[in-house]
Amino acid sequence: MAEIECRDLVKKYGAKVALNGVNLSLEKQRIIGLAGPNGSGKTTLIKLIERLLTPTSGEILIHGLQPGKETKEIVSYLPDRDFLPDWMKVKELLDFFEAFYSDFDRVKAENLMDKLEIDYNLNIKKMSKGTREKVQLILCMSRKAEVYLLDEPLAGVDPAARDYIIHTILENYNEDGLVLISTHLITDIESILDEVIFLQNGKVLLHRNADDLRAETGRSIDDYFREVFAC
């Protein structure tokens, strides 16, 4: 059974079609890149899987279940925007995640935060943008989830932060699970991908094994991406 199944998935915002007949079957024990230019439908697809949006038509199944309360217990989601409440302290965030998610590993989260010398009594609003982003990532990756949805985790960060993000993902995800990373920066994550999906105008242009795609095209996935989308 596929971990995530999308069947004839359509999402419209009024007259605008964001996703148009998406069919995907994604297996566990894979790191999959969801790539495409801005406006291709990447974030919409991730929000549908997370059930922040509902499809216009079609179906999504996660571990055989429709998105809902049960799937939120097995899906760890990192949005493309800051979700940390300014009024909370770091300790309160840890308390919240520990109470809300049964798969949250507080010891792991604290170890990762200790390496960054983060003060647990610090209010979120007093953190730098970079530190907030790292805290969000730590919270997401400290869950032993079956699915990790990472929406543009590398967007707008410097090279050192990118290295930290990639290292944190690789060292902490549940290897029996599925990692879906949306990005338009293929070059930064190509080396860790098992599969890649290209989205264009809300449609799946390509879904291939990463090694097979490199062998068939004779070039890196990043080079092929730039050719396909004329970057």
Listing of model-derived features with the role each one plays in the protein:
Residues 148-152, 157:
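Catalytic Walker B motif of ABC-type/P-loop ATPase nucleotide-binding domains
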Residues 50:
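Helix-to-loop junction immediately C-terminal to a conserved catalytic motif
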Residues 58-71:
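Conserved ABC transporter NBD signature motif
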Residues 80-135:
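ABC-family P-loop ATPase nucleotide-binding domains
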Residues 35-37:
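The feature captures the beta-strand-to-loop junction immediately N-terminal to the Walker
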Residues 207-208:
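ABC ATPase "signature
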